[in-house]
Swiss-Prot record:
Protein name in UniProt: Outer-membrane lipoprotein carrier protein
GO biological process: lipoprotein localization to outer membrane; lipoprotein transport
Locations listed in the record: Periplasm
Stretch forming the signal peptide: 1-19
GO annotation, cellular component aspect: outer membrane-bounded periplasmic space
Biological source species: Francisella tularensis subsp. novicida (strain U112)
Assembly and binders: Monomer.
Record keywords, A-Z: Chaperone, Periplasm, Protein transport, Signal, Transport
Family affiliation: Belongs to the LolA family.
Function of the protein: Participates in the translocation of lipoproteins from the inner membrane to the outer membrane. Only forms a complex with a lipoprotein if the residue after the N-terminal Cys is not an aspartate (The Asp acts as a targeting signal to indicate that the lipoprotein should stay in the inner membrane).
Main subcellular localisation: periplasm
Length: 205
């Protein structure tokens, strides 16, 4: 009986720690109302041993606005106004327009727009490595193995690490981070340059 009680206490304490970690993470994310930053991204492909480095800038504004601009080595823009998602490839002069997806596997940035603890709990098991680092393990997603979110001591986003089931690892480091900045909603709309090949998937049945 004593062993059963000890086991119950142990399991209960683990559940509390998971809940506390999720709550702490949500509190940090909630405090990011808007944000701009530069980023350096490294993609390591474990299958081919190829590395791909890129850099650019990003901005987000809650509850639904997001922009991710890669300036090197290729010109690519990913912009969302909460309804539509524009994916523009400047090298190919091609624009793909999609409906906004809630698929974390495709768009891990959606975590940064989260404001509902229940949604995080539904999708992930969250553990805290320390006061500023969190590991998110998807409960159902088959593509992502884990996401690590690291904050600075003053609660600014420092980096994201994403490991996938395809043996790929991505680390995105943020610098020149500014939070609670005034960003116009219209900056999250996208107008294609002239002569762009446009594929509008929102019009498909």
């Amino acid at each position: 009986m004593k062993k059963i009680i000890i086991c119950f206490i142990f399991v209960f304490s683990i559940n509390i720690s998971f809940a506390d970690a999720t709550s702490d993470l949500i509190d940090k994310i909630k405090n990011i109302h808007s944000m701009t930053a530069n980023f350096n991204q490294k993609l390591i492909d474990g299958q081919t041993n190829n590395n791909l480095n890129s850099k650019g800038n990003m901005s987000l504004k809650k509850p639904q606005y997001f922009k991710w601009i890669t300036t090197s080595p290729n010109n690519q823009e990913i912009v969302s106004n909460g309804t539509k998602l524009w994916i523009y490839d400047g090298d190919l002069d091609q624009l793909i327009i999609k409906k906004v997806s809630n698929d974390i596997a495709q768009f891990p940035y959606l975590i940064l727009l989260s404001k509902n603890t229940n949604n995080i709990n539904k999708l992930f098991t969250v553990t805290a490595q320390d006061n500023n680092s969190y590991i998110l393990k998807p409960k159902n997603d088959q593509m992502i193995d884990s996401i690590k979110i690291k904050f600075t001591p003053n609660n600014q986003l420092e980096y994201l690490e994403i490991s996938t089931s395809l043996n790929q690892f991505t680390k995105i480091e943020f610098n020149n981070v500014k939070t609670d900045v005034d960003i116009s909603n219209t900056s999250f709309d996208f107008t294609a340059p002239q002569d762009t090949d446009i594929i509008d998937e929102t019009k498909s049945a």
